[in-house]
Swiss-Prot record:
Cofactor(s) the protein requires to work: a divalent metal cation
Protein name from the UniProt record: Oxygen-dependent coproporphyrinogen-III oxidase
GO molecular function: coproporphyrinogen oxidase activity; metal ion binding; protein homodimerization activity
EC numbers: 1.3.3.3
Main function: Involved in the heme biosynthesis. Catalyzes the aerobic oxidative decarboxylation of propionate groups of rings A and B of coproporphyrinogen-III to yield the vinyl groups in protoporphyrinogen-IX.
Keyword entries, A-Z: Cytoplasm, Heme biosynthesis, Metal-binding, Oxidoreductase, Porphyrin biosynthesis
Catalysis: reaction(s): coproporphyrinogen III + O2 + 2 H(+) = protoporphyrinogen IX + 2 CO2 + 2 H2O
GO biological process, one term: protoporphyrinogen IX biosynthetic process
Organism: Coxiella burnetii (strain RSA 331 / Henzerling II)
Annotated PROSITE patterns: COPROGEN_OXIDASE
Amino acid sequence: MRKDRQNKITEVGIYLKGLQNRLCRAFEKEEGESRFQETLWEKPNGGGGRTRLLTEGHVIEQGGVNFSCVYGNQLPPAATQKHPEISGFAFQAEGLSLVIHPRNPYVPTVHANFRFFIAGKDEADPRWWFGGGYDLTPYYGFEEDCRHWHRVAKKACDRFGEAIYPRFKAACDDYFYLKHRNEPRGIGGLFFDDLNEWEFKRCFEFIKILGDSFLEAYLPIMQNRKNHPYGERQREFQLYRRGRYVEFNLLYDRGTRFGLEFGGRTESILMSLPPRVVWRPNWEPEPGSEEARLYEDYLVRRNWVSVSGA
């Protein structure tokens, strides 16, 4: 059983590192000249990772694509919040995390994460599960972009049953929600945790299909909007809305909490934060403006794949 456990870790790791390579190449192609800078890190007796960060690009103001493979004698609290019965178990975890903060305010910020855990006190019967998904955070809304994003997500999910997309879309809407602001972080996407309801091979296949669908979902949006004209007003609104991203990641994000509780590399954990951000107390958008439309038409729960969008 120990060999089977290690085979799972190896198989998932090979896929995630390959996906990291593909994602970085695709974004570097959009940039033209800027490149991701790689940092290899290790945690003594705890694993390590491969952090790739692109800064001050023409299209991407800051973006990170990170891979990590870590292990320990006890799962951090963030990993056992929903399952206290496995608290104290030894574990191994692998994950790929991506956050892209574009320069142009008309290009949405995007996040993706794919992770695998295996834990147990008994080597003969370890617990394993997958988690992850992807979500989109626009600053200026375009109906066609939102529909494209969700239709690609649905197409990937539908191979595993028609109930999967609505379930994981609803979970995404629930998770990426700022309770203290009473608003969602963006227009959502997919989110799932503790996925082990199928056999390992099928669960892993689901992860691979989602991972492979990410560029299809996001790149056309980036390509269509990266040269959209903008001015100081749009840039200031982008920086203001980025504040919500910071608030969510520091207050609610379980991945951030897991990394900090585990004692991972802080710079890699916090690469999700935007490089520039502003807060404006009591700010309200001008009625009828593009900024107001974001709140009225996009930062609401919607069925983006239906004809009406209701």
